[in-house]
UniProtKB/Swiss-Prot annotation:
Function: Transcription factor that plays a key role in the response to oxidative stress: binds to antioxidant response (ARE) elements present in the promoter region of many cytoprotective genes, such as phase 2 detoxifying enzymes, and promotes their expression, thereby neutralizing reactive electrophiles. In normal conditions, ubiquitinated and degraded in the cytoplasm by the BCR(KEAP1) complex.
Subcellular location: Cytoplasm, Cytosol; Nucleus
Gene for this chain: NFE2L2
Protein name: Nuclear factor erythroid 2-related factor 2
PTM annotation (Phosphoserine): residues: 40, 214
Renumbered residue ranges of the record's region Disordered: 42-61, 333-363, 380-451, 577-607
Assigned GO CC terms: cytoplasm; cytosol; nucleus
Keyword entries, A-Z: Acetylation, Activator, Cytoplasm, DNA-binding, Glycation, Glycoprotein, Nucleus, Phosphoprotein, Transcription, Transcription regulation, Ubl conjugation
Length: 607
């Protein structure tokens, strides 16, 4: 036999290759390319599709991140439902930006640079809690002559070292200027933070700093400041000090200041130590202010103690307050102007006429609210009703100091009180301000317009600002033809036209959104009703099913009882009953019952 040479089993033969080519040509003729059968080609296409899919997912993720970053810069308008750009926080300019001393402008930091904890740390580092009176005290002590050793002064001590006053003054002035520039820069940074813009922060030191033209003026300012800071401690002990100490104090202090400055300084110091306004000082504290020719800048201890006892022990009639300058709207401002014009460069909160002490606020609130029994709304109603210029109500009771018994008035005092009451009744009615520092009463009829403007929407405020003669409701709710006719009758500029179109567009969008929400709510309510109906029907069907199961179970029980009863009545040829394990009863469609054995051979017996 001839042996046939077979090709290796791993390689196809030439005949197989020809056959494969023939089959491929047939597939190509049928529209199938050869790449369909190429596994490597299909794998490359699969990898390419996978890369395209991953690239698409990456692009979608990038687009989502861009949209998220874009919407983070917008805020949702609850009124119209559209997104508006967030307005950056405006920088609050400092009150001392126009000062001649400090022309340095601090850079405005970003809103995220400083937080509350950083601000507190910055304040703690900038403002160390030490007594600033040490420098001024040392400066003043260097110019005060030596006090005898047998007099113990609680305020002044001997200078620790001998140094020329001019050198010390120049050093102190330079240090104070540097510190104040740093303080101004710190406050500029603090006021630019959005978290602290809601606070009405006022820097008294920066607002009340004046120029220092010469070392002599700086010396006067330092000494005057120390004199003011030591006045509250001297008030309690001025009656017990010896005349020798008072004379030494007056001589040393008046040698520095002129007569005009010392008299003006006395007025301001008494005004600030008593924490009252200049208007109240003219009425109640006239005995405290001494003339330069008589007291030489300092009140005597007898006058001081007598005036204090009269003021504290005497009754205060609230009807007299209506005659006071502080409660008079058209009182002259010459006294305040004189006090503001100071050459010593010291300001004791008298530059701002609207600033009042807490005592005045309490007194005015008691006088205007508690004793008269009026609230803000009641005062507005009284102002708005005609015929209320002159009213006679219950007499205002006098206020006595706590702990003192009420003493009966003498005949002269009663006559004077009656005269004052009649004068107050005949005087034209003037409204009581919130505090004596206010020039105008807050209870004016302008409140009604301001309250109405507070309830206006943003579109109404814009339309009012651009003087659009149509109401916003008319712009939104008019049909197209009526709206075009209304617009053709007026001439508008570009800003007004853009605002009108914007108002109408957003109003229509708002109405459409409301209608959409209304339809959705109606659909939700309808679905809830259908769901409740289906629940009721389900409960009803479950109840019927339970009843049917019960009746079916009862029928089966009755049927089994009947089956056993009929089966027990059957007998075989020998008169024996049939065994239920071997036979069973079956009923045909015509109603006949047969006894059928359970074996395969049916041995039927008809009854």
């Amino acid at each position: 036999m001839m042996d046939l040479e077979l090709p290796p089993p791993g390689l196809p033969s030439q005949q197989d290759m020809d056959l494969i080519d023939i089959l491929w040509r047939q597939d190509i003729d049928l529209g199938v390319s050869r790449e369909v059968f190429d596994f490597s080609q299909r794998q490359k296409e699969h990898e390419l599709e996978k890369q395209k899919k991953l690239e698409k997912e990456r692009q979608e993720q990038l687009q989502k991140e861009q949209e998220k970053a874009f919407f983070a810069q917008l805020q949702l308008d609850e009124e119209t439902g559209e997104f508006l750009p967030i307005q950056p926080a405006q920088h609050i300019p400092s009150e001392t930006s126009g000062s001649a001393n400090y022309s340095q402008v601090a850079p405005i930091p970003k809103a995220d640079d400083l937080y509350f904890d950083d601000c507190m740390q910055l304040l703690a580092e900038t403002f160390p809690f030490v007594d600033d009176n040490e420098v001024s005290s040392a400066t003043f002590q260097s110019l005060v002559p030596d006090i005898p050793s047998h007099i113990e002064s609680p305020v002044f001590t001997a200078p620790p070292q001998a140094q020329s006053p001019e050198t010390l003054i120049v050093q102190v002035a330079t240090a104070v200027l540097d510190d104040m520039q740093d303080i101004e820069q710190v406050w500029e940074e603090l006021l630019s933070i959005p978290e602290l813009q809601c606070l009405n922060i006022q820097n008294d030191k920066l607002a009340e700093t004046s120029t220092v033209p010469s070392p002599e003026t700086k010396l006067t300012e330092i000494d005057n400041y120390h004199f003011y800071s030591s006045m509250p401690s001297l008030d309690k002990e001025v009656g017990n000090c010896s005349p020798h100490f008072l004379n030494a104090f007056e001589d040393s202090f008046n040698s520095i200041l002129s007569t005009e400055d010392s008299s003006q300084l006395t007025v301001n110091s008494l005004n600030s130590s008593a924490t009252v306004n200049t208007d109240f000082g003219d009425e109640f504290y006239s005995a405290f202010i001494a003339e330069p020719s008589t007291s030489n800048g300092m009140p005597s201890s007898a006058t001081l103690s007598q005036s204090l006892s009269e003021l504290l022990n005497g009754p205060i009639d609230l009807s007299d307050l209506s005659l006071c300058k502080a409660f008079n709207q058209n009182h002259p401002e010459s006294t305040t102007a004189e006090f503001n014009d100071s050459d010593s460069g010291i300001s004791l909160n008298t530059t701002s006429p609207s600033m009042a002490s807490p005592d005045h606020s309490v007194e005015s609130s008691i006088y205007g609210d508690t004793l008269l029994g009026f609230s803000d709304s009641e005062m507005e109603e009284i102002d708005s009703t005609p015929g209320n210029v002159k009213q006679k109500g219950p007499k205002t009771p006098s206020v006595w100091p706590p702990g003192d018994p009420v003493q009966p008035l003498s005949s002269s005092q009663g006559n004077s009180a009656a005269a004052r009451d009649s004068q107050c009744e005949n005087a034209p009615k003037k409204e009581v301000p919130v505090s004596p520092g206010h020039r105008k009463t807050p209870f004016t009829k302008d409140k009604h317009s301001s309250r109405l403007e507070a309830h206006l929407t943003r579109d109404e405020l814009r339309a009012k600002a651009l003087h659009i003669p149509f109401p916003v409701e008319k712009i939104i709710n008019l049909p197209v033809e009526d709206f075009n006719e209304m617009m053709s009758k007026e001439q508008f500029n570009e800003a007004q036209l853009a605002l009108i179109r914007d108002i109408r567009r957003r109003g229509k969008n708002k109405v459409a959104a409301q209608n959409c929400r209304k339809r959705k709510l109606e659909n939700i309510v309808e679905l809830e009703q259908d769901l409740d109906h289906l629940k009721d029907e389900k409960e009803k069907l479950l109840k019927e099913r339970g009843e049917n199961d019960k009746s079916l179970h009862l029928l089966k029980k009755q049927l089994s009882t009947l089956y056993l009863e009929v089966f027990s009545m059957l007998r075989d040829e020998n008169g024996k009953p049939y065994s239920p394990s071997e036979y069973s009863l079956q009923q045909t469609s015509d109603g006949n019952v047969f006894l059928v054995p359970k074996s395969k051979k049916p041995d039927t017996k008809k009854n």
